[in-house]
A protein has these predicted regions:
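Conserved small/polar residues in nucleotide/adenosyl-binding loops
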Residues: 203-208
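Active-site entrance/lid segments in N-terminal catalytic domains of soluble metabolic enzymes
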Residues: 1-169, 175-201
């Protein structure tokens, strides 16, 4: 079976219906990015806002994005006779469980998990990034019954060992490899930001 991966091609029920009609074996919906939700909230915040107003704005944007994504799942399920796989990309542990529960309730056939965290701490412990994959998988498996698929990046030092541990802890499948947005640095604010990403030949891809 040919599975259509998460992209702009899978961000509407109409596009997904056409992909199913053309022979796709399954469809992975356009990923829901937690950091994108947070970025939009930050861009709309005003320094003059009270803390309560900023919190309300962030929660409003979060709920709006989640509602749109759940609607995409439901509408795609109505028009597609093939499996519809949701995809989430988060960087805080607290959000994974809430996202996963709502996605299962919306009717997704499976859930793809993307994990990305910039390791900038001086006291970083080797192996903690790999362990984070396992811990998040365990937490999600305790709360939902649909298959959980782990999507891995290409910068792991020992992907075979990690994949073995993911299967041992209940992963239904593993996707190789994810191409994350490349981080950049705002030299004026000295902050991490997401870099631009364009279609280029494989030889021009940058490594993290």
């Amino acid at each position: 079976p040919i599975i259509i991966s998460s992209s702009g091609l899978t961000n509407s029920a109409g596009k997904n219906k056409k992909l199913a009609e053309d022979g796709a074996g399954a469809i992975v919906l356009k990923s829901l990015f937690e950091e994108q939700i947070m970025l939009e909230a930050d861009q709309l915040k005003d320094p003059a806002f009270y803390p309560e107003a900023s919190d309300y704005l962030e929660e409003y944007i979060r709920e709006h994005k989640l509602s749109e994504y759940l609607t995409l799942i439901k509408e795609s399920k109505k028009v597609c006779p093939i499996p519809i796989i949701a995809s989430i990309n988060c960087y805080t542990d607290s959000e994974w469980i809430d996202f996963a529960k709502m996605i299962e309730e919306a009717g997704a056939d499976a859930l793809e998990i993307n994990i990305l965290a910039l390791q900038s701490e001086v006291q970083y412990t080797y192996g903690s990034f790999e362990q984070r994959h396992i811990d998040i998988l365990r937490h999600i498996k305790k709360t939902i019954k649909i298959p959980v698929i782990m999507k891995l990046g290409d910068n792991l030092t020992n992907p075979v060992a990690l994949i073995d541990q993911l299967y041992a802890n209940g992963a239904a499948a593993v996707v190789l490899f994810n191409r994350f947005y490349q981080p950049d640095i705002n030299i004026e604010k000295m902050e991490h930001i997401s870099g631009e990403i364009f279609t280029v030949s494989y030889t021009h891809l940058t490594l993290p």
